[in-house]
């Protein structure tokens, strides 16, 4: 599943909805306090797309900004099914290593080896899991 955390840049949303569903699953947009439990399979990978930096992801401008701890709370409260064993890929600029390390710390050790981010500026197109751009959170 792709989960889009950008509400002010239509190009991010557009790219999310144009990704190959056989690789990435269906795309959903984040709405505050809206449950997406049931959309993500227990073993399905989760691809998060947004604008980002080493401290936050979300909108390009103001209005939606999530620290790693805030994203972890959203994911555990509204997205991840019980017993989730898939991987989480944060496709946003500069999310590795600091942001995804914070996300791993917030989600806990059960997620070790399953959270990835990106170094530097990235293109809007989400890359498949085996792409060399993904950096594992440590």
List PLM regions with ranges.
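Catalytic cores of nucleophile-dependent amide-cleaving enzymes
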Residues: 45-128
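A cross-taxonomic marker for long C-terminal extensions/tails that follow the last structured domain
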Residues: 124-138
């Amino acid at each position: 599943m792709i989960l889009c955390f950008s509400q002010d840049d239509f190009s991010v949303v557009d790219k999310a909805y144009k990704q190959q569903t056989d690789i990435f699953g269906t795309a959903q947009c984040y709405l505050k306090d809206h449950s997406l439990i049931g959309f993500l399979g227990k073993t399905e990978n989760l691809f998060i797309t947004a604008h980002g930096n080493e401290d936050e992801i979300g909108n390009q401008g103001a209005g939606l900004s999530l620290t790693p701890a805030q994203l972890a709370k959203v994911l555990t409260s509204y997205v991840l099914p019980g017993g989730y064993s898939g991987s989480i890929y944060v496709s946003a600029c500069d999310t590795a290593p600091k942001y995804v390390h914070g996300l791993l710390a917030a989600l806990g050790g059960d997620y070790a080896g399953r959270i990835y981010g990106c170094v530097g500026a990235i293109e809007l197109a989400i890359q498949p899991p085996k792409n060399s751009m993904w950096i594992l959170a440590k």
